[in-house]
Curated annotation (Swiss-Prot):
The keyword Metal-binding does not apply. This is Protein GrpE. It is found in: Cytoplasm. Residues 1-23 have a biased composition (Basic and acidic residues). The keyword Nucleus does not apply. It comes from Citrifermentans bemidjiense (strain ATCC BAA-1014 / DSM 16622 / JCM 12645 / Bem).
């Protein structure tokens, strides 16, 4: 009987040990599990909100980049020819001077006029227009560069007396100012 008692006692110990193991392996209570899941969900919600915010910022940055590239592309198309035009303007000036200093009408002078007209027409197609500077126009430092001053009783002070060199605009932006002489009041 001792053996039975001993075996029974051993069996109880094993049962107690297995119960302990079961207690250790038992899942958390439902309330604890819910709390744990809510915390995990809240953390994932914050992470999701941060990722969404990051996505929106990146998308806005990309859109701004696209707009900037498009604007730069338009600027290049609009003003990219500025360097070439600046090289052509002195030749244009020389053609105008040749016509102004011609002593007589000849086929050569007429050819120069025709060449000048064609060149001006071609430049106009690319957005180049002359700065209007008729005599008597008020001096505007945005479009004119004063090369000198002349005392004049006939003209209002600060008006254009003469144009040395025409100014030009490229798509309404100043390419080269007109070089002019400006009237001042005569000394008393």
């Amino acid at each position: 009987m001792d053996k039975k008692k001993h075996d029974s006692h051993q069996h109880e110990k094993k049962a107690d040990a297995s119960q302990e193991k079961v207690e250790v392996a038992q899942p958390l209570s439902d309330a604890d599990r819910i709390k744990e899941l809510e915390e995990a969900l809240a953390a994932k919600g914050l992470e999701s909100a941060a990722n969404w915010d990051k996505y929106l910022r990146e998308r806005a940055d990309l859109e701004n980049y696209r707009k900037r590239v498009q604007k730069e592309k338009e600027e290049i198309l609009k003003y990219g020819k500025e360097e070439v035009i600046m090289e052509i303007l002195p030749a244009l000036d020389n053609l105008e001077r040749a016509i102004d200093h011609a002593n007589e009408e000849s086929a050569i002078v007429e050819g120069v006029r025709l060449t000048l007209s064609m060149l001006l027409s071609a430049l106009k197609k690319f957005g180049v227009t002359p700065v209007e500077t008729p005599q008597g126009t008020p001096f505007n430092p945005e479009f004119h560069q004063a090369m000198g001053q002349v005392e004049s009783a006939d003209q209002e002070p600060n008006t254009i007396v003469a144009v040395f060199q025409k100014g030009y605009l490229l798509n309404e932006r100043l390419l080269r100012p007109a070089m002019v002489t400006v009237a001042v009041k005569p000394a008393a």
